[in-house]
Amino acid sequence: VWENHRHDDAVMTWPGNQIPAAFTTVKGRKPSVEIHKRRVSIMSVINELIRTEANGTLSFGNYSLAAKSKVEDFEHEGDLYKVKTFKEITKLERNGMFVYESVPGTAVKDFAVTDTTVTFKVEGFEDAQITVQLEDDCEYEVFEDGVGVGGMKTNMSGKLSLSVELNEGREVEVKIVRK
């Protein structure tokens, strides 16, 4: 039985306290049946690789995949998107042009772009180097979880790179604002 809570938290219970083999520990032992009384976080990967959210934003990426997977010609607001993703990289293109890349792979939720701002929530197994396409040769202020991490300038091709500290099961909200 899965009970959904805010964000991606869930409470898990199993009939007769039979814990699935997928929940074994590193040493191969099953955890205590008490696990059904604790809250655990579910990976927020995007199983369909890319989707449009109810609020009109894009979500994409699946960092849990061992093999490269992609979706091409995904239509969103009149543009065609292509996503390539797996544990080592996640890359998004719009109409054949670069938009987002992370190394290693990540899951991105609520990706939105306006004239002056890019916002998204990102999750991954470990810290990631993220590159986004912005306006050429402009200055931006970067925020992670509402905290300013400094000003950055895009290069002549409009790319801005930042490092984000990630831990599986926890999203980091990124906001990039043109100065």
Residue positions per predicted region:
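Short, ordered beta-strand-loop transition motifs
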Residues: 5-6, 110-117, 154-158
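Catalytic domains of carbohydrate-active enzymes that cleave complex glycans
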Residues: 1-86
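C-terminal beta-strand-rich structural cap/linker in extracellular carbohydrate-active enzymes
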Residues: 19, 23-33, 67-96, 100-102, ...
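A short, sequence-level motif marking secondary-structure junctions
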Residues: 39, 135-137, 153-159
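Small-residue (G/S/T/A) turn/hinge positions that recur once per unit in extracellular repeat modules
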Residues: 104-108, 147
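Beta-strand signatures of extracellular beta-sandwich domains
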Residues: 141-143
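Surface-exposed beta-strand/loop patches in extracellular or lumenal glycoproteins
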Residues: 121-138
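Surface-exposed loop/edge segments in extracytoplasmic proteins
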Residues: 146-152
